[in-house]
Structure formats: C-alpha cells, structure tokens
C-alpha cells in the first residue's frame, strides 16, 4: 500500500506540471517548449528561498518566476514574430543560465531547511491541499471572461481578434498561467525531495504530455473541468505505471524518458492513423458507388 501511496504522492507533486501542459497543448492549442526551463526556474527560486527559511515565499516566488518565463515566450511569439516552438526553445535555453545563476551551482541541498509541508501536517496532506486549491482556482478562472477568451483564442484566434479582443494579451496570459503552474510544480518538488538541481527540468514537456494523454484515455475529452482533473489523474497514474515497471524490473531507470516518449508518440499517432483508415474506407465506398 505504501508503494502506491508514495507513487501517487509523487504524481501529485508533478500534477500542476500536467495542468500547465494541458493549458497550452489542449486549451491554447499551442506547442510550448518553455516547460523544461520554467520547471527548473521555479525549483531554483523555491530552493534558494527555502534555504533562507522562507518556504511559502519560495512557492509563490517560484510560480511568479515561471509566469515571467511564459511572458518572455509570449513576447518572442507576438512581438518578435518567432515561431512558437522556436520561441519556447530560446526561452528554455536562456533559462539554463538563469537557473544555474540563481542556484549558485548545479544543485543545492535543503536537508536542514524548513519546508512548507512541515507546517501543514506532512507531505501528503500539504501537497494534496495545495494541488486541490490550485486546481479549483484554475477551473474557476476558465469560467470567467478572461478564461473564456483564452479558450476562444485556442479554438479560433482570428474570430477572437475580429471581436476586438487583444489576442496578444490573451496569449501572454495563457502562457504566463501555464508556466506559473509548471514552475509551482518544480517549487513543490524541490522542497519535497530536499534539493534543487539545475538538470531537473530535462524531459518535463514529454512527462507532462504523457500525463495529459493518459488522463484523456481514462476520462475522455469532455470539457475544461474534466480535462484539468484528468491531467491530475494522468500524472498520478503515470507515476504508478513507472514505479510498477521499475519495481518488477520491466525496464531500467535509464529508459524512463524513452517510455514517456513512446507513450506520447503512440497516443498521438493512433488518432491520425484511424482518421487515415476511415478516409481510405470512404474513398473505396465512393468508388464502388
């Protein structure tokens, strides 16, 4: 039982990463590769402030740092006219230097530093509470005018622009929110694992996508509320799957990122293959008719 609880707890620590990826990938319908950098940025800021005995300030500042990274990516996309994928790569690359500067080295230990969960009754209740509160707030936000504008921009940006809505501000807000959640996940993880590492963000975009896709397989794609909840659930299930694979020697620890990439690639390829098969059948039926 402890095995599953520990895996579920780790999944909750990464849950906000999955929600952030869900916002850009599904709601904004935009690929954002800033995630690897903003995750570590939030972790670095949280680590430094936690080491200075300010754990809660570390969480807040980590989230704000991620939001700033998202705004930079938005600026590159909207004002510099850089392709979204390249804009994310540029921000992510620049953040590596920022992160190692903030940490002051490749990693920092938090062994004797106070952690946010010590005040809230332990890791599980603290992480669960923070995740639940953030998920509720994000869900409520997407029912507001601002949230609806982001959802509309993801569906049809030209229509939103024709409605005299500032699409630049909408994109900035969406990227800031998504990367704030990703960075908050990194901030939480730093305090829960007891150290911050400059290489911790490697592959986070793939892990986030895998969590989102696993959640959609379980819950389906049925609206914004179910989508956000499914991202959290997908993160937990993903960690349980990985833990089971490692426990029963089905794969080595070095193969984790390969497994994540295969999950994402297969899940994204199946709908396209199914659509191609349907189109082929329809063409055959039309020729017969």
Q: Language-model segments: what does each one mean?
A:
Residues 3-54, 76-80, 213-221:
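Single transmembrane alpha-helix segments in multi-pass membrane proteins
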Residues 84, 88-143, 172-173, 196-198, ...:
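Transmembrane helix-bundle core of multi-pass membrane transporters
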Residues 21, 54-93, 132-135, 234, ...:
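Alpha-helical transmembrane segments within multi-pass membrane transporters and channels
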Residues 182, 186, 192-258:
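Transmembrane alpha-helical segments in multi-pass inner-membrane proteins
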Residues 26-31, 69-110, 121-123, 194-198, ...:
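Short loop segments and helix-boundary regions at transmembrane helix junctions
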